From Swiss-Prot:
Entry-linked PROSITE patterns: PCMT
Signal peptide limits: none
Reaction catalysed by this enzyme: [protein]-L-isoaspartate + S-adenosyl-L-methionine = [protein]-L-isoaspartate alpha-methyl ester + S-adenosyl-L-homocysteine
Family: Belongs to the methyltransferase superfamily. L-isoaspartyl/D-aspartyl protein methyltransferase family.
A Pfam family assignment: PCMT
Official protein name in the record: Protein-L-isoaspartate O-methyltransferase
Length: 220
């Protein structure tokens, strides 16, 4: 897909600088860096924050939600170890930026968002950009999307106090889940690998996400 009509030389220059920052911070996957270099993050940011589109920081997108810091997007995506043929479940569509990164790197993306307005806005952005491998659902992300399970990869972009049971069930044997786990104010990002009935955790570092709300998440 050619995004030139949505871009400017200034934005492209800022993306290149951002990619260099991400490299310096330890992101190694060239595929992930290429996706960040390609995708116009400014299209996913509210008008009042346009000047900050390519800063390495999270930004508000309304409804108490945020578009994640680019480093965290890159870290989570890199941790999924996508080869290009995966079916991915994303919990928390948000602005749709992480969704677009995933759509560049995997075969099919199934994304669930509980806030209707955010889902509709993300859907419009991704359609305008030409992505036709993304499927959207309005609902409780802690329940996953059972209809299309199992998934090769699951990415959760909100913080849970534990792994929601439905997501464990919907992850394919041998699959990978990336999820922030902890309290409301601070969590650790984990890469979870499923092997039979066992789930092996690898700690990727401290993070701060908005709470994952739903039947198997925070209740308020």
């Amino acid at each position: 897909m050619d995004f030139k009509k949505f871009d400017t030389p200034e934005y492209e220059h800022k993306r290149r600088k951002l990619v260099e920052i991400l490299k310096d911070e330890g992101i190694k996957s060239q595929k992930v860096l290429n996706a960040i270099l390609k995708i116009p993050r400014h299209m996913f940011v509210p008008q009042e924050y346009l000047s900050l589109s390519y800063e390495n920081e999270a930004l508000p997108i309304g409804y108490g939600q945020t578009i994640s810091q680019p480093y965290i997007v890159a870290l989570m995506t890199e941790a999924l170890n996508l080869q290009g043929n995966e079916k991915v479940l994303e919990i928390g569509t948000g602005s749709g930026y992480q969704t677009a990164i995933l759509a560049e790197l995997a075969l099919e993306i199934y994304t669930v968002e509980r806030i209707k307005e955010l889902l509709e806005e993300a859907k419009k952005r991704l359609r305008v950009l030409g992505y036709n491998n993304v499927y959207f659902k309005l609902g409780d992300g802690t329940l996953g999307w059972e209809e299309f399970a199992p998934y090769d990869r699951i990415i959760v972009t909100a913080a849970s106090y534990d792994i929601p049971e439905p997501l464990k069930e919907q992850l394919k044997d041998g699959g990978i889940m990336v999820i922030p786990i902890g309290g409301r104010d601070f969590q650790y990002l984990y890469r979870i690998t499923k092997k039979g009935d066992n789930f092996y955790r690898e700690n990727l570092g401290g993070v701060r996400f908005v709470p994952l709300k739903g039947e198997y998440g925070w209740k308020d």
